[in-house]
Design a protein with these regions (language model features):
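C-terminal alpha-helical interaction module
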Residues: 4-16, 35-380
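Double-stranded RNA-binding/processing signature
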Residues: 23
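Short Gly/Ser/Thr- and charged-rich N-terminal loops/segments
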Residues: 27-30, 37
Length: 380
């Protein structure tokens, strides 16, 4: 038996007799905030020849990490890799077409924002893209070949064409063999040095906007305009703290009072944004900036998953006339619908978060039509 102890999850591996073939019995354990030991799962499975103990071990913190305070509040971990790509030789990573690859989940609002910026700048030929399977189990984000076409929307999961990884944790271990935190998306991978450059969506979006402009089909698109830099940073922080991460603080809270505080703050923020968007087509008059897409990535998931799954159910986005019209307006921008897959989004949340949804039943609704006329042109 081999036992690996991580910061939040322990795992015990029992090697079975050879007559059973290359199989392993795996027990995944977690120490709760109260100090008690919880068995997350126990299973026996046939080991793949290409799957080493290290690559499995690297997945142990993938699902339901103990990112919570003693009071039951969700506290998100910091991004581990923050290297920078430049086009002026100021960093060790140079902007080059075909060198970097983006690993994402289409369910993740953080990762989806990088996909949107990649699309808006027109750098698809310069930056490759691979989508992980939407269901993140105890082994973490996985690369699996799809057995059929997804009904509508964006590309679905695929195998890894760059490294042949089975799990995204292998990219983390290749970069840092001692990494034992939660494996997250997005990941910007350097095929030349074979390591992760950055796993912070804010950094990746800015690099796509600036450093890769020489390779962009849409060079005039600037999502971080300098003339509103300070105000843009302020509204971005507001959206992140109260909306983007706010729904997670509500959904991942493990006690009533932290949940209620987080949930109420989400709707206080939405009320403020509803008022702001009653006077302006976008957050900054008539131009779309990165903060708009930051907000969009939560709004487009809200009625489908955050309202029910995360219990942010005081109101729906469709109950906010300006936010709903704004959401439809952004969704109808060229190329954006291709980056959104509601089926993928719902399957991830409802099938992955088994502590919240033990049955793993995926709801068939709601019926969402973001293609209707939105009427936001009146605010031009």
């Amino acid at each position: 038996m081999q036992v690996w102890k991580g910061n939040r999850v322990n795992a015990a591996f029992y090697e079975l007799p050879r007559k059973f073939g290359p199989t392993l019995s795996l027990a995944v354990l977690r120490v709760n905030a109260s100090g008690s030991l919880q068995t997350l799962t126990q299973m026996t499975f046939r080991a793949l020849h290409s799957c080493s103990f290290v690559s499995i071990r690297g997945c142990m913190n993938a699902q339901f990490p103990d990112e919570e305070t003693k009071s039951g509040e969700f506290k998100r971990q910091e991004d581990a890799f923050r290297e920078w790509i430049s086009n002026d030789a100021s960093t060790r990573y140079a902007a080059e077409a075909g060198r970097y690859h983006l690993y994402v989940s289409l369910a993740c609002p953080w990762a989806s924002r990088t996909v949107i910026v990649r699309k808006l700048k027109g750098i698809e030929d310069a930056i490759g893209l691979t989508v992980v399977d939407p269901v993140r189990d105890e082994l973490g984000w996985a690369f699996r070949d799809t057995s059929g076409d997804i009904p509508t929307g964006a590309p679905f999961e695929s195998t890894d064409p760059i490294n042949g990884f089975q799990f995204l944790s292998e990219a983390y271990r290749a970069t840092d063999p001692n990494y034992d935190e939660r494996v997250t998306v997005p990941v910007l991978w350097d095929a030349k040095t074979k390591r992760i450059v950055n796993n912070c969506e804010d950094d990746i979006c800015r690099m796509f906007n600036d450093a890769f402009n020489d390779f962009a089909q849409n060079k005039t698109v600037d999502l971080f305009p300098k003339d509103i830099q300070a105000e843009h940073a302020k509204i971005s922080d507001f959206i992140y703290e109260n909306v983007n991460n706010g729904v997670y603080r509500a959904g991942f809270a493990t006690r009533q009072r932290p949940y209620e505080r987080a949930c109420r703050r989400v709707f206080e923020a939405l009320d403020e944004l509803e008022q702001r968007l009653s006077k302006s087509r976008y957050l900054f008059t008539n131009r779309i900036v990165e903060a708009d897409w930051r907000l969009f990535c939560t709004l487009v998931r809200f009625d489908a998953v955050y309202h029910g799954h995360f219990k942010c159910n005081l109101r729906r986005i469709i109950d906010y006339p300006n936010l709903q019209g704004y959401l439809m307006d952004l969704y109808q921008q060229p190329g954006i619908a291709e980056t959104v897959n509601v089926d993928h989004i719902k399957r991830h949340y409802y099938m992955t978060h088994t502590a919240i949804n033990p049955t793993r039943i995926v709801p068939i609704g709601p019926l969402l039509d973001l293609t209707k006329p939105h009427g936001r042109e009146r605010l031009n």
